[in-house]
């Protein structure tokens, strides 16, 4: 069995505005664990960018796990912060004692952070083998696909519903596609033309810029009369959240699934939210909608998304705009921070085999 090297590498946010690939010691392989060598790691342009900018609440406040409140005090994470990242794909290279369900050579996906290798629980990864026929590069989409599917479930989409999806980044585009597969008529909203084009390719019946005359709310009423059944907001922009509220019908549902930062001056809750009795539902990958009970959990989200990849009903290839060596991570985050309009899914390449594996 292959063993970890004497030196590993991990992406570290050294301070706000500074991110780099640094050396670290390989983790010790213990019973029930496996060592995974990373091939690819997808970069989040939302959560991880908040760590780069220093705006993530975990680096400014303390998360009280018992009260589930952010409170004043020592931040939960202090710079330098290493090991963030939640969209990894790699190969099992070593089995620890008592590890079962996996073999050396298995290709798996999961969460172990932007690092060259990791030691992960075998029982966790045994259910996360890359499905046959799925390009390993596309394995970076499992987590974001689960986030998108969770938002669609929160919207309670029914066959024939009219749904507006705000924000056509990676998660927004996947949500658009999943909503179409669920039987919804979808309108996609984004300020970048290329993203609107991708949304149309994913099945959106209408695509709108973010600031049409009269606002998106007026367009939604022209599109379906009386407003949409539901809207999903995935940009993390308060103005977009306000327009999502304006776009739905009386007593319609808005799913707030973006990672919102700072104050909410653009959110006017005394207007359509109040007078149309709009319901706002938060969607976050830490849990699935309560009304679904125990039937849906994180594992099922991953499994269902993987089934769509295997069937080819979701084709995420066009969403990958950048594949870069991990040691170029500083340039990657500078580009994301600048808001490059052509960038969607950036993938860090660690030790992927030549040509990948089909």
Model-found features: residue ranges?
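Mid-domain Rossmann-like dinucleotide-binding core that forms the NAD(H)/NADP(H) cofactor-binding site
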Residues: 135-212, 218-219
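A structural motif shared across PLP-dependent enzymes of the aminotransferase-like
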Residues: 83, 111-124
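C-terminal substrate-binding/catalytic core of Rossmann-like NAD(P)-dependent dehydrogenases/reductases
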Residues: 217-221, 225, 267-320, 331
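Glycine-rich beta-strand-centered segment in the early N-terminal region that forms part
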Residues: 27-42, 54-112
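Residue-level marker of beta-strand positions
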Residues: 33, 40, 106-107, 117, ...
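C-terminal hydrophobic helical "lid"/dimerization subdomain
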Residues: 1-4, 245, 296-358
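Glycine-rich cofactor phosphate-binding loops and adjacent beta1-alpha1 units
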Residues: 205-281
